[in-house]
């Protein structure tokens, strides 16, 4: 299903380039595999459930046909995401989340009920230490920040971006709407402080 192989981060291969998956007419929950590629995530017992809940909420609120789709989320560490970031973005440093949209074949004209394979949306990688550090530095709950990053990564897989101010505003509005549906405060405001 995934470009991320279960096991060590050395088993990860990178993204396929040139995604053209864009918004379609309806949404449904994609099959989502969560791969724990770094032991540090095991201290967060609810991390997998948090990610799955965020992906489900995002899929339910965006205008993209994801019901027959598959994606993988790799929960890695700073070393793992740093290697991916260096290899695919030329930035030799850790980051919080990376998304690797898969290229999409043209399914138009495929007969209903045919043997057309599910769409691979792509892969998301999330780094534990960076997520933990950002949540602590910003006074946010870890699960809220993890949810935000899973939603952010998913939105990239279905065609959202933030290269321009207008794109960023659209993407942030979608993130706020999805997270509000999960009872999570606006991640761009100061209201999610841990007391």
UniProtKB/Swiss-Prot annotation:
EC number: 3.1.-.-
First-tier enzyme category under EC: hydrolase
Cleavable signal peptide: none
InterPro entries assigned to the protein according to its UniProt record, in alphabetical order: MetalPrtase_cat_dom_sf_prd, YbeY, YbeY_CS
UniProt subcellular location: Cytoplasm
Positions annotated to bind Zn(2+): 152, 156, 162
Tree of life domain: Bacteria
Essential cofactor(s): Zn(2+)
Cofactor note (record): Binds 1 zinc ion.
PROSITE patterns named in the record: UPF0054
GO cellular component, one term: cytoplasm
Entry keyword set: Cytoplasm, Endonuclease, Hydrolase, Metal-binding, Nuclease, Ribosome biogenesis, rRNA processing, Zinc
GO BP field: rRNA processing
Single Gene Ontology MF annotation: zinc ion binding
Role this protein plays: Single strand-specific metallo-endoribonuclease involved in late-stage 70S ribosome quality control and in maturation of the 3' terminus of the 16S rRNA.
Similarity comment: family membership: Belongs to the endoribonuclease YbeY family.
Record protein name field: Endoribonuclease YbeY
């Amino acid at each position: 299903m995934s470009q991320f192989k279960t096991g060590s981060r050395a088993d990860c291969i990178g993204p396929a380039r040139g995604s053209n998956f864009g918004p379609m007419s309806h949404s449904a929950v994609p099959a989502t595999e969560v791969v724990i590629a770094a032991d540090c995530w095991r201290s967060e017992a609810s991390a997998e459930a948090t990610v799955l809940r965020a992906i489900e909420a995002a899929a339910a609120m965006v205008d993209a046909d994801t019901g027959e789709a598959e994606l993988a989320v790799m929960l890695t560490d700073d070393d793992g995401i740093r290697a991916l970031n260096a290899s695919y973005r030329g930035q030799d440093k850790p980051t919080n989340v990376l998304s690797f949209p898969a290229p999409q074949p043209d399914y138009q004209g495929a007969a209903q009920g045919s043997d057309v394979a599910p769409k691979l949306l792509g892969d998301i990688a999330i780094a534990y230490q960076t997520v933990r550090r950002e949540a602590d530095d910003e006074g946010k709950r870890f699960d809220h920040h993890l949810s935000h990053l899973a939603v952010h990564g998913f939105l990239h897989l279905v065609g959202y971006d933030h290269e321009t101010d207008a794109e960023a505003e659209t993407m942030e509005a979608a993130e706020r709407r999805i997270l509000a549906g999960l009872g999570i405060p606006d991640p761009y405001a100061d209201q999610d402080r841990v007391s």
